Structure formats: C-alpha cells, structure tokens
C-alpha cells in the first residue's frame, strides 16, 4: 500500500516532537522519578481501584469528565506512567492543532508542521509543566483545534466540523476557566473573521455547534458560575497579597489583586533573548536543579512583584518565544504584505495561489498580527493601565487575575505568523522547487524548536519516588536544618526511610530538601450523593458520545461502503 505524503509528514512531525519531548523530560521518564510540579500531584495510589474511585467522586460532585481524563486520572495506565506523558501529549495536541489549522489555510506541510513544533515548545506555553498547571494543558489538548475547525466549518460546512467545533471548545473549558475564556474570545473573533473573509454566515451550523457546546460544557459552566467566581471574590476580600491588603478601598484592592503578575515591559526582551533574568523562583526546582546540574538559575526579574514593592518576584516558567519564531513571524508579515502591495514585476515571493487565495492570506496575517499586538499590550496589565482598563471593564474582566496570561495568546499568534514566514521563505523565487532550499528552511525550523526545548528542559527537576512507590506512601516535601537530624525522632524516621534527603536547599549546606513519607490512609470516604452537577455530567457524557460516534461514522462509513461494494 502506497503511503500518502501527508501521512509521512504526520509521522515526521510525531517523530521530531517525540525526540524533543523526550529531551525536555529526560531523567524523569522512569516510574520512580517525576518532575517537580507544586500544583499537581506527583504521588498517587498504586491501586487502580483508588484512581477509579477518585474519578467517580469527582464526577458525582462536579459532573466533570472529558476524554483526556482517561489519561489524567490514571484510569487505564498507572498514574506514575502518565505523569510526564499527559503533559507531553497535551503539547503534542497543541502543535498538531496549529498544523491542522495552517494546512487548512493552504500552507505547505513544512510550514504547518514547523509552526506546530514551535508552538508546542514555546516558553510560557510549555514550561508551565514545572508549576503543575494541569488545567492549562488540558485546554491545549482541545482548544487549539478550534481554530482549524472554525475555518473548515465556515468554508466547507461539513457536519463533523460543526460537531467537533462545539465539542472541542466545551472540553477545553473544564479545568482552566480563565485561560479558556481568553482563547474562546479569540476563537470567536476568528470565527467572525472567517465569515467576513468567506462572505457568508452559516447560521444552521453555528446553532448546531452552540447546542453541542452548551450540552457538553454544562458542568463546567455551572462550576465556573457557582464556585469559581465566588472563590475569586473570597480571595480578593481577604487581601491575599500585601499590596492589595493595604489598598485604600475595595475598588483599588480589586484592581491591585487582578493586575498582580503583570508583565514588566523591560522583560519583553526575553521573548527573543532566553534567560535574560534567570529562570525560576521555585525553590524546589532550584535546589534539585543544582543537585543534578541542570543549570537552572534563580529568577531575578520583577514579574510577580507586589505593587510599589522595592523587591520580590515569583514565576515558575519561561517567557522565551524564540528568536527563530519571532524572526519567522516578522518574515511572514513582511512577505505577505510586500507580495500584496508590490507590482508583479517587483515581487520577490511567488505564493502561486491565485488572487482570491492571496486576499484570504492577507486577512489571516492581518488578524494574527493585530491580535498579537493587542494581546501583548494586555499582558502588560498595570504597566499599561489605560489599555488594560478596557479589559477590566468587560464582563468578568475584574475576575481575570495575572495579565501575563495574555502572553499565551501572543505566543499562539506569533507561532501562527511564523508558519506564514516559513511559507514565504519556501516560496522565494530563488528557493522555490529546490531541495536545498527545503532542507535549509527545515534546518532553521528544527534549530528553533530545539532552542525552545533546550530552555524548557531547565524547568524539569527530577524527584526520586522510589521509596514512595515501594511503600505506597503519601509524601510531602519539607526543609530540615542540619541540627534537625540530631533529633531522635527525625533520626529514627531517616533510619526507616520515612525521611529521604533529596538535595541541599537553595545551595545552603545547612539546609536540606527532604521527602517526608507517611502511611497512606485507606480511602473510606463515602461516595457523594447524586447531585444536579452529576445530572449535567450525564448530559455532557451523552453529548460527547454523540459527537464521537457521529464523527467516527462520517469518517469510516464511506470507506466501509466503498470496500463492501468492491
């Protein structure tokens, strides 16, 4: 059987991604080792029954269950096996989603797959695994595909595109409501842009996608309105940061709280210069990084600094978009607009797509260029107050903490533009059709992806879990002084393996980062009663099943009928 070219590109993309992801998480793929992830569990029950019981409790109390929970909840494989795999798989889906989108826009396989690789390992996008922000990674498993589905649904109007558009947008909402809201607004604007570009509004398909969206996302929307907003109000009322607690009135307190973690303008240089102000503030990552020689450095910038404070910061991620990514994005903008505005005699780039396709390409590049600029300005937060006040005044805008989150959208837009830059290089008049040119551009993309992965690698600090798994214990990480080990109780715990030293704490020879093991208590919690959330969860599961079956039938049915007719 002849292998199609598109399948070869897919396999190539997968192979390169697997190699780079293996490099990023190198040293933690063993079941006995996991990366530091402060906001995610790295210690799990060994029994599958406990994983299933935990997932059932979650469903009965919140109604939440989506396809990726099979991986994230450890329902089929050991949760220790899935610890790094679930993050890597989400990054893979994000890269594949951008490649899917750009292929639909007519870009070549190299441009599409290259942009996907750059997105998958983009600094802020990928390095948040070190913080354990699993909800963000669950969103990217589905959310990026919504752009390609929006484009195809408007252009082609096929049933499966509308069903998947509603489903993917809903699935992405379950565990990271704030970032989901930002990207859903961007997706919605792009959907409207597609309608303008194609000069039509398919209202029937839109209604179908909306019905699927609300049916599947019902438990998530209920949780956001009932729990998340109330929780954020309690955070603000308690004045959880020093600067917010000292505010003059409630309005100022809310503004300070929401705009903490604004991106300092001077740190925008890190978009193209990696590690300009160090790497991370996480003491566990720094301590273990020094122990294993990863080269990670303390963060010395101002991100996370309280308002008007002379010092202080906190971040657990990179801001590096990539020099190659930014360069290709600028090339994409320049080539498209130069090609559109120059006379045929002066054109240096031949896209060879016809005037209508060229017009649509300009639409897309314009959209992502403007979106990148706006999202960057929004990420500045209180450092660009007149602009961010516009976001703050929108519905739910005063609930969206940490304006630096807008940098995720900036990264996405720049990677999409980078795809157009790759395409522009491939279509230079003196490179087009030459294998050497293809190899040169491909090498540039691979260098850019490796450069990003090399930076992400610094945030992977391995934690030894052998003793935890051998005894099926719970574990907490703590800091002990040298003299604490002279305590008879601590000495006895060290002797029987209940206290395991991991590294010197922040390089201090008198402080130690340790694991403290405690016996795992049997899970005797009764199952929560059936609730309204569980009924909404049943509706969500039914909607998901209908979408999956319908799409499978639409994809496989014609082929089966063709095979039977032979």
Each predicted region: which residue ranges?
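Membrane-embedded helix bundles of polyisoprenyl
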Residues: 17-20, 92-105, 109-195, 205-223, ...
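Perimembrane helix-loop-helix junctions
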Residues: 183-214, 224, 235, 333-354, ...
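Start-transfer (signal-anchor) and selected internal transmembrane alpha helices
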Residues: 1-26, 205-212, 327-330, 334, ...
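Membrane-helix boundary/interfacial segments in multi-pass membrane proteins
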Residues: 42-44, 125-137, 306-319, 374-414, ...
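Transmembrane signal-anchor helices characteristic of membrane glycosylation enzymes that use polyprenol
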Residues: 9-44, 212-226, 374-377, 447-452
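Transmembrane alpha-helices and membrane-interface helical segments
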Residues: 96-100, 144-152, 187-195, 325-339, ...
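Transmembrane helical bundles and short interhelical boundary loops of multi-pass, membrane-embedded
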Residues: 221-227, 231-235, 428, 432-566
């Amino acid at each position: 059987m002849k292998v199609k070219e598109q399948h070869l590109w897919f396999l190539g993309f997968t192979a390169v991604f697997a190699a780079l992801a293996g490099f990023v998480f190198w040293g933690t793929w063993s079941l006995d080792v996991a990366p530091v992830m402060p906001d995610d569990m790295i210690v799990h029950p060994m029994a599958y029954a406990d994983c299933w019981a935990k997932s059932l409790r979650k469903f009965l109390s919140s109604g939440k269950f989506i396809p990726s929970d099979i991986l994230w909840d450890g329902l089929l494989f050991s949760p220790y096996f899935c610890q790094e795999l679930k993050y890597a798989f989400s990054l893979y889906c994000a890269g594949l989603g951008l490649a899917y989108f750009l292929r639909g826009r007519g870009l070549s396989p190299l441009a599409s797959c290259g942009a996907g690789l750059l997105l998958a390992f983009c600094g802020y996008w990928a390095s948040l695994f070190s913080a354990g922000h699993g909800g963000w990674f669950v969103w990217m498993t589905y959310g990026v595909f919504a752009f390609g589905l929006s484009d195809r649904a408007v252009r082609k109007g096929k049933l499966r595109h509308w069903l998947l558009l509603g489903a993917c947008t809903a699935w992405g909402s379950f565990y990271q409501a704030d970032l989901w809201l930002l990207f859903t607004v961007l997706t919605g604007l792009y959907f409207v842009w597609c309608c303008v570009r194609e000069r039509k509004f398919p209202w029937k398909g839109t209604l179908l996608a909306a019905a699927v969206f609300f049916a599947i996302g019902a438990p998530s929307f209920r949780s956001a309105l009932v729990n998340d907003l109330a929780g954020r109000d309690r955070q603000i009322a308690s004045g959880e940061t020093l600067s917010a607690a000292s505010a003059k009135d409630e309005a100022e307190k809310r503004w300070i709280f929401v705009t903490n973690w604004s991106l300092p303008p001077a740190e925008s240089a890190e978009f193209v210069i990696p590690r300009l102000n160090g790497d991370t503030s996480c003491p566990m990552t720094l301590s273990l990084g020094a122990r294993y020689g990863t080269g990670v450095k303390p963060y010395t910038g101002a991100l996370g600094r309280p308002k008007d404070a002379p010092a202080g910061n906190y971040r657990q991620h990179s801001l590096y978009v990539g020099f190659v990514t930014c360069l290709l994005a600028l090339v994409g903008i320049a080539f498209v607009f130069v090609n559109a505005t120059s006379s045929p005699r002066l054109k240096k780039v031949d896209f060879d797509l016809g005037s209508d396709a060229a017009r649509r390409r300009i639409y897309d590049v314009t959209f992502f260029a403007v979106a990148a600029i706006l999202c960057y300005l929004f990420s500045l937060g209180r450092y660009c107050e007149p602009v961010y006040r516009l976001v703050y005044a929108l519905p739910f805008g005063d609930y969206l903490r940490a304006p630096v989150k807008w940098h995720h959208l900036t990264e996405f837009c720049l990677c999409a533009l980078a795809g157009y830059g790759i395409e522009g290089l491939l279509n230079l008049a003196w490179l087009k059709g030459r294998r050497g040119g293809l190899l040169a551009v491909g090498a540039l993309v691979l260098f850019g992806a490796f450069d990003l992965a090399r930076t992400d690698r610094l945030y992977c600090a391995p934690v030894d879990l052998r003793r935890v798994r051998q005894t099926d214990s719970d574990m907490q990480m703590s800091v002990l002084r040298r003299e604490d080990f002279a305590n008879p109780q601590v000495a006895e715990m060290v002797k029987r393996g209940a206290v395991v030293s991991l590294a010197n704490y922040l390089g201090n020879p008198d402080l130690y980062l340790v694991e403290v093991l405690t016996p795992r208590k049997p899970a005797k919690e009764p199952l929560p009663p059936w609730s309204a959330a569980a009924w909404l969860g049943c509706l969500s599961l039914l909607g998901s099943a209908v979408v999956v079956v319908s799409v499978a039938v639409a994809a496989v049915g014609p082929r089966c009928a063709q095979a039977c007719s032979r």
